[in-house]
Amino acid sequence: MTAPSQVLKIRRPDDWHLHLRDGDMLKTVVPYTSEIYGRAIVMPNLAPPVTTVEAAVAYRQRILDAVPAGHDFTPLMTCYLTDSLDPNELERGFNEGVFTAAKLYPANATTNSSHGVTSIDAIMPVLERMEKIGMPLLVHGEVTHADIDIFDREARFIESVMEPLRQRLTALKVVFEHITTKDAADYVRDGNERLAATITPQHLMFNRNHMLVGGVRPHLYCLPILKRNIHQQALRELVASGFNRVFLGTDSAPHARHRKESSCGCAGCFSAPTALGSYATVFEEMNALQHFEAFCSVNGPQFYGLPVNDTFIELVREEQQVAESIALTDDTLVPFLAGETVRWSVKQ
């Protein structure tokens, strides 16, 4: 990576955790990712969820149809794990190059997760098959029991689900997605080479004070929820250390404005337009720009066993204002950092 003071040239990055939705929303948001990223792991939590090879093939085609001419973008599809999923269907999708990974949502943990897994035991045959064929498991790591505080759900998941699972299936490759706590940062750092993590821009830039002090900021509300500043700092220190099993996963999750700014608002930040510059800002603040390219463009492919991208992009360090909103057919979409001045942006 070359880093003159005002320009960062890096190998084209990938987004290892992305929501593209479907229909008109899909057509609106895809270009914001495809113009920057070479590949993206696409989440399967549609309604109904993507649980078959045929559904994934059809969804992939809808995504590709929304990619503008001149963008070189490959969506990497995932299978939504359910209690009733057939291991043979999963293996077929993996062998045919349709499924790159499978996603574990604890039932009702986040948007469109009501079909999720009720217990690890219920999907053990599927997980055993994944371990056997080398298919990565992507985990939304929160317990969902009503009696457990929302700020404690990730830490409790580690001790009650993640560690027992990894002890039981020692060869299973696991990505602990969108980690938000010091507990998770320490757990991944101390784990073996079969455990990795993604981190979102909002969890590196903000903590729960930013979301709640002086008024509720619904466009910072996501799941897992922002935590206290000691957890934010642990995440920042993990990425700044150059640790090679943590990588870019925006968890960009678009919702129309009226679904965010509501008496019962949806969780998710639409960060695709601003995420890469946000990450660059964090790495610069941590005096760690020398590790920025690996986080964005190398660590993910390395863990997944895929080649790195062979093209490059540039970010420029000049103040730019983020758009207040993006037009949808019958509403607007508010991007992460809407209306704010950002320090780094992708060179057009």
From Swiss-Prot:
Annotated Gene Ontology MF terms?
Answer: dihydroorotase activity; zinc ion binding
**Gene3D superfamilies linked:** Metal-dependent hydrolases
- Residues where N6-carboxylysine occurs? 103
Q: Could you say which residues bind Zn(2+) 2 here?
A: 103, 140, 178
Answer whether the UniProt record assigns the keyword Hydrolase to this protein.
yes
Q: What does this protein do?
A: Catalyzes the reversible cyclization of carbamoyl aspartate to dihydroorotate.
Q: What EC designation does it have?
A: 3.5.2.3
Gene name tied to this protein: pyrC
Q: Taxonomically, which superkingdom? A: Bacteria
Alphabetized UniProt keyword annotations: Hydrolase, Metal-binding, Pyrimidine biosynthesis, Zinc
Q: Which residues form the signal peptide?
A: none
Q: Which NCBIfam families match?
A: pyrC_dimer
Family that this chain belongs to: Belongs to the metallo-dependent hydrolases superfamily. DHOase family. Class II DHOase subfamily.
- BP GO annotations: 'de novo' pyrimidine nucleobase biosynthetic process; 'de novo' UMP biosynthetic process
- PANTHER family assigned: DIHYDROOROTASE
Name the chain's protein. Dihydroorotase
Q: Which reaction does it catalyse?
A: (S)-dihydroorotate + H2O = N-carbamoyl-L-aspartate + H(+)
Organism this protein belongs to: Shigella dysenteriae serotype 1 (strain Sd197)
